[in-house]
């Protein structure tokens, strides 16, 4: 394994350095080839490194940042006032080649805008998309995008997302000839928005995409598709609804029957069932798949949940490591070059999203 350097916006997210710095130390323990650049306020970071040993400190560097982009700031305002912020400086480290990827739990809109401004989209990509890999009930994985980077998406963008998601599923998740579906309100051809139906028509013409049609939201975790494509608004609502239900379910498994009097054998049975069911469904725990890759850029950017805990942020760091090792941007660029003549000639240069 070759050495990797990642830039962490340690000031972003709901909990800032109190979560991101311990997660950074956890990541260093797990990967001896990893070096981390901690971008943020040194006064907030340094005390949290007290438990770091000499070896860990040799693979850490604090990059001082003057400010933090607020989580509730409007993206346009945040971008204009971003100079000197921890998020922008972390992205600039990637742009300058000092880091191979950036991880941030900060403002999603600002991260999207700054990443597009500084790192630039790949040739043929109009706007990047947030993508994550979710587990499903068959113990496999499903690539889902967009998860909030683009609220409104035209047919061109949906087709581009499908291509990028297919590459990610094949190259990172290692699914041969991945099935691709569009999230819709029904499986019938006439259902859905014009943008979805137009994207469907184009995807059918691209030989390198294994397009299988529409999928409804209630089948997200069934394993019926390997890649699920949607606009950012729908994807974000779907993901957060699913995560809320899973967290509630796992919580109920742990608390069921607490405080009630039971015979000793019923208590033993209850505890056995709790442990058994918790193990059976633990792979659905949202903390285990935190970290959405901002796909379609010339560099690697990972967006962590703002409310991520230490374990979840460490998972986001690992997502960045995998994306760099698998050369995701380069592989997407290569696939786009091969796909353009076959399918994108039907689109207006990847700009307008209208069929010719």
Swiss-Prot record:
Predominant cellular place of this UniProt entry's protein: cytoplasm
Pathway in which this enzyme or protein is active: Lipid metabolism; phospholipid metabolism
Listed EC numbers: 2.3.1.274
Record keyword Magnesium present: no
Reactions accelerated catalytically: a fatty acyl-[ACP] + phosphate = an acyl phosphate + holo-[ACP]
InterPro entries to which the protein is assigned, alphabetical: FA_synthesis (IPR003664), Phospholipid_synth_PlsX-like (IPR012281)
GO biological process, one term: phospholipid biosynthetic process
Gene Ontology terms, MF aspect: phosphate:acyl-[acyl carrier protein] acyltransferase activity
Keyword Cytoplasm: yes
Subcellular location: Cytoplasm
Gene3D superfamilies from the UniProt entry: Isopropylmalate Dehydrogenase
Function, as annotated: Catalyzes the reversible formation of acyl-phosphate (acyl-PO(4)) from acyl-[acyl-carrier-protein] (acyl-ACP). This enzyme utilizes acyl-ACP as fatty acyl donor, but not acyl-CoA.
PANTHER family in the record: FATTY ACID/PHOSPHOLIPID SYNTHESIS PROTEIN PLSX, PHOSPHATE ACYLTRANSFERASE
Oligomeric and partner information: Homodimer. Probably interacts with PlsY.
Family: Belongs to the PlsX family.
Protein's UniProt name: Phosphate acyltransferase
Gene symbol of the encoding locus: plsX
């Amino acid at each position: 394994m070759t050495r990797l350097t990642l830039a962490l916006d340690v000031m972003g997210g709901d909990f800032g350095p109190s979560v991101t710095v311990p997660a950074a130390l956890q990541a260093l323990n797990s990967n001896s080839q990893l070096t981390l650049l901690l971008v943020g306020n040194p006064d907030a970071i340094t005390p949290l490194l007290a438990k770091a040993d000499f070896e860990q400190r040799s693979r850490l560097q604090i990059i001082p940042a003057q400010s933090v982009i607020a989580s509730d700031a409007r993206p346009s305002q945040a971008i204009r006032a971003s100079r000197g912020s921890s998020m922008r400086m972390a992205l600039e480290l990637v742009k300058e080649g000092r880091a191979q990827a950036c991880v941030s739990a900060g403002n999603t809109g600002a991260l999207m805008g700054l990443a597009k401004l500084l790192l630039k989209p790949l040739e043929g990509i109009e706007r990047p998309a947030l993508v994550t890999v979710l587990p499903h009930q068959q113990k496999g994985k499903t690539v889902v995008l967009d998860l909030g980077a683009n609220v409104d998406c035209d047919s061109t963008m949906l087709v581009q997302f499908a291509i990028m998601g297919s590459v990610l599923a094949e190259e990172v998740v290692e699914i041969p000839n991945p099935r691709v579906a569009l999230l819709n309100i029904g499986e019938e051809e006439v259902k859905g928005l014009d943008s979805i139906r137009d994207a469907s028509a184009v995807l059918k013409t691209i030989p390198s995409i294994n397009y299988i049609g529409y999928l409804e939201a209630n089948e997200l975790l069934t394993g019926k598709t390997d890649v699920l494509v949607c606009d950012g608004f729908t994807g974000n609502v779907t993901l957060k609804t699913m995560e809320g239900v899973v967290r509630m379910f796992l919580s109920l498994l742990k608390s069921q029957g607490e405080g009630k009097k039971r015979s000793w054998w019923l208590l033993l049975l209850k505890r056995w069932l709790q442990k058994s069911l918790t193990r059976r469904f633990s792979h659905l725990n949202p903390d285990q798949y935190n970290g959405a890759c901002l796909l379609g850029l010339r560099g690697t950017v990972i967006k962590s949940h703002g409310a991520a805990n230490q374990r979840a942020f460490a998972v986001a760091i690992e997502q960045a490591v995998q994306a760099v090792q698998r050369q995701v941007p380069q592989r997407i660029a290569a696939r786009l070059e091969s796909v353009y003549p076959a399918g994108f000639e039907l689109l207006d240069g990847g700009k307008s999203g209208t069929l010719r």
